């Protein structure tokens, strides 16, 4: 797994995102991670996910329960070739995501102020995405239920979780998916082709 390092311009955008996240967090409770640990917890962990996932050029990505934009905004900054949809049911948090996408001039982001369950049934999103990413949104079995309708056959869910081997083991017998611990703290679940 090759390390991914932000350019100076990307680092600037990511730092602005973290600064805004810190300011807005006082009103919206977007993250429990303090600003002095945000780079490590938000950016570096997402960079690890991107390195493990080896996302193909031009892929369609969805971040379920985006909240403060982790990992979705980091993915959009690091990979401007991707189209990234940030799903956030809380309209106030979705407002933050719209603000940050505009502030950072991220034209590859779309914000959907909806529930993931609704998006999976929407013909514009049902089985239209190559990759679903998420962090601390739901227990892995529920996250898989939310992600599978959004993924194309062969698409993959990449989730930042605490114990990836245990999460993968809990999903081992689930029909239609293949789960594995891709790296420490990273769960991968592939939607099998029909």
Where are these regions (language model features)?
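Class I SAM-dependent transferase core
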Residues: 1-57, 62, 92-109
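Short, structured coil/loop segments at alpha-helix boundaries
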Residues: 7-11, 72, 89-90, 122-123
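Residue-level preference for alpha-helix termini and adjacent loops
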Residues: 29-32, 69, 118
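Conserved S-adenosyl-L-methionine
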Residues: 63-67
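Conserved SAM-binding loop of SAM-dependent methyltransferases across substrates and taxa
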Residues: 68-81
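S-adenosylmethionine
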Residues: 79-85, 89-194
